[in-house]
């Protein structure tokens, strides 16, 4: 069981997860990465160390171009064929975008 003393402030979690405080608030608002505890009086968010894995997955999915709704769905499907299929589809999309960009570059050269 995680105790209150084990939880990290949003700033600490931001540093460790490499997600900005602004994005952590955004992900909380969209239900993607909800803090382990929110103080009822101050509204301060606290995160559990185990949530760093979710944060890493969110960062990686965002970095490959997926949006909040896709990230939310994929986190729920982690470890399933849906996860693998979605990443394969995103890979194909990125390859197509790269091909199109190369064609546009050839018009300049």
Regions found by a protein language model. Give the residues of each.
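Short, charged amphipathic alpha-helical surface segments
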Residues: 59, 71, 77-109
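Basic helix-turn-helix/winged-helix DNA-binding cores
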Residues: 1-68
């Amino acid at each position: 069981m995680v105790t209150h003393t084990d939880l990290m402030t949003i700033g600490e979690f931001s540093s460790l997860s490499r997600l900005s405080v602004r994005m952590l608030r955004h992900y909380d608002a969209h239900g993607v990465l909800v803090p382990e505890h929110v103080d009822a009086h101050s509204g301060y968010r606290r995160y559990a160390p185990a949530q760093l894995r979710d944060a890493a997955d969110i960062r990686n999915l965002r970095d490959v171009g997926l949006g909040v709704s896709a990230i939310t769905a994929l986190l729920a499907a982690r470890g399933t064929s849906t996860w693998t299929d979605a990443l394969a589809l995103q890979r194909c999309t990125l390859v197509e975008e790269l091909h199109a960009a190369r064609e546009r570059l050839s018009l300049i050269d």
